């Protein structure tokens, strides 16, 4: 490396590059270039520096540091550029330049991935770094943010009920117990190798029991929640510590209420409670409750028992809590949105349906999928058939809709890592939606 004032020269694969210390400092302390600076961000002088790497990729990455813009010539494979970015510690810079901060109203279809499994998908979950995982029966396919598939996780004919990310390197799977086998439950797997790292056990009366694990949720204080079904009416919500893997609590299901069969769990940080929703058609009736594990108390509950005088279309198919408005949003099979008031026990015993949200006037497909809900940074998302609707504002006005031309109905979708992933039912395909990076002014 040669120094002339603020100018720096590199020999990369036989090509000479000249840049400035200011440009290199944009790479950050943890990068390859960050090691060239002392603790006060003054450049050290190791002499001439030869880097035996690809010069074409180096030129792209240097331009990225200089301008913040990513321009990839057609002769450079993206896989090679990603590999070089990892060497220089610039993978986060590259990812940030490829797509911008998530905005449901500015999403565009970036890519569709096909042919990953036979049969219908169970769930798709977005990872924290832009990757995803997909459960198909007893198999889970894992993709990194470059959408390259990692080794498959196979549970040997145990059906996977749910899957969730602890962090970019670890995935939790919940599975059914197989009759007479004593397996099932919940396990922690490596996202990169598919290796089982830990199996979470459940104990009742100080005895380890077999169980089926269902819906998953995670809290910021490193707790894992899952709905549990045991053999001796041991139904309820189990709680484990992510760090130790040990069970720390269990909320037992009371007679006349449903917890162990829950379709959805959601941790509410503001209320320090867990939302538990058991929905039709898993049960004949819908049960939604908030559990406070500090007091072992169900602090709020709602059910449609005794209130089903309405048409079948008013059955609740998904639910999500909205803490800022003290309400729970629900959706029926025609994408009518409904709202239940959390400030009243039992929600006032009724759902305030918003008929103006009904969007799908066309004929239902042969194999419709139940609608799903998601809430992300003040935007509400609802899937219906082959599209996803985006609602915004205090009145939840429809502002945009995501739709592609093939793949069939959307059976699940997930938001994370500044991406939206949509899993289709009729074809082995999932879509990746991204927000375009802001223009360079």
From Swiss-Prot:
SMART domains: BTB
Keywords: Ubl conjugation pathway
PROSITE patterns associated with the record: BTB (PS50097)
Gene3D superfamilies in the cross-refs: Potassium Channel Kv1.1, Chain A, YVTN repeat-like/Quinoprotein amine dehydrogenase
Pathway assigned to this chain's UniProt record: Protein modification; protein ubiquitination
BTB domain mapped to chain residues: 6-74
Any GO BP: protein homooligomerization
InterPro entries: BTB/POZ_dom (IPR000210), SKP1/BTB/POZ_sf (IPR011333), T1-type_BTB (IPR003131), WD40/YVTN_repeat-like_dom_sf (IPR015943), WD40_repeat_dom_sf (IPR036322)
Coiled-coil residue spans: none
Function: May act as a substrate-specific adapter of an E3 ubiquitin-protein ligase complex (CUL3-RBX1-BTB) which mediates the ubiquitination and subsequent proteasomal degradation of target proteins.
Swiss-Prot/TrEMBL domain comment: The BTB/POZ domain mediates the interaction with some component of ubiquitin ligase complexes.
Protein name, entry field: BTB/POZ domain-containing protein At4g30940
Organism of provenance: Arabidopsis thaliana (Mouse-ear cress)
């Amino acid at each position: 490396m040669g120094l002339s004032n603020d100018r720096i020269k590199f020999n990369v694969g036989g090509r000479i590059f000249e840049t400035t210390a200011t440009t290199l400092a944009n790479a950050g302390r943890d990068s390859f270039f960050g090691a060239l600076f002392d603790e006060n961000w003054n450049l050290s002088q190791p002499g001439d520096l030869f880097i035996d790497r690809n010069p074409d990729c180096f030129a792209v990455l240097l331009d990225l540091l200089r301008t913040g813009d990513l321009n990839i010539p057609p002769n450079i494979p993206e896989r090679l550029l990603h590999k070089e970015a990892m060497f220089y510690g610039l993978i986060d810079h590259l990812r940030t330049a490829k797509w911008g901060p998530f905005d449901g109203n500015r999403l565009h279809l970036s890519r569709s991935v096909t042919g990953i499994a036979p049969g219908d998908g169970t769930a798709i979950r977005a990872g924290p770094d832009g990757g995803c995982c997909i459960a198909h029966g007893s198999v889970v396919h894992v993709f990194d943010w470059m959408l390259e598939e990692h080794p498959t996780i196979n549970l040997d004919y145990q059906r996977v009920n749910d899957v969730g990310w602890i962090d970019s390197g670890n995935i939790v799977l919940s599975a059914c117990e197989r009759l007479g086998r004593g397996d099932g439950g919940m396990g922690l797997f490596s996202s990169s190798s598919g290796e089982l790292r830990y199996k979470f056990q459940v104990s009742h009366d100080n005895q380890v029991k077999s169980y089926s694990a269902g819906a998953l949720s995670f809290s910021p204080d490193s707790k894992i929640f899952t709905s549990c079904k045991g053999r001796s009416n041991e139904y309820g919500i189990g709680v484990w510590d992510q760090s130790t893997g040990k069970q720390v609590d269990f909320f037992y299901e009371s007679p006349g209420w449903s917890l162990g069969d829950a379709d959805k769990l959601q941790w509410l940080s503001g209320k320090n409670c867990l939302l538990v929703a058991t929905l039709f058609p898993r049960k004949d009736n819908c049960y939604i409750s908030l559990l406070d594990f500090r007091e072992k108390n169900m602090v709020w509950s709602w059910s449609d028992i005794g209130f089903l005088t309405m048409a079948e279309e008013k059955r609740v198919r998904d639910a999500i809590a909205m803490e800022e408005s003290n309400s729970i949003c629900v959706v029926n099979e025609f994408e009518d949105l409904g709202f239940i008031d959390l400030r009243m026990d039992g929600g006032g015993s009724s759902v305030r349906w918003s008929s103006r949200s009904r969007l799908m006037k066309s004929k239902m497909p042969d194999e419709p999928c139940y609608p799903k809900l998601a809430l992300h940074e003040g935007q509400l998302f609802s899937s219906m058939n082959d599209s996803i609707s985006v609602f915004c504002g205090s009145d939840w006005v429809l502002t945009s809709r995501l739709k592609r031309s093939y793949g069939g109905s959307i059976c699940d979708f997930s938001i994370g890592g500044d991406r939206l992933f949509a899993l289709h039912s009729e074809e082995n395909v999932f879509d990746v939606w991204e927000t375009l990076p802001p223009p360079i002014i």
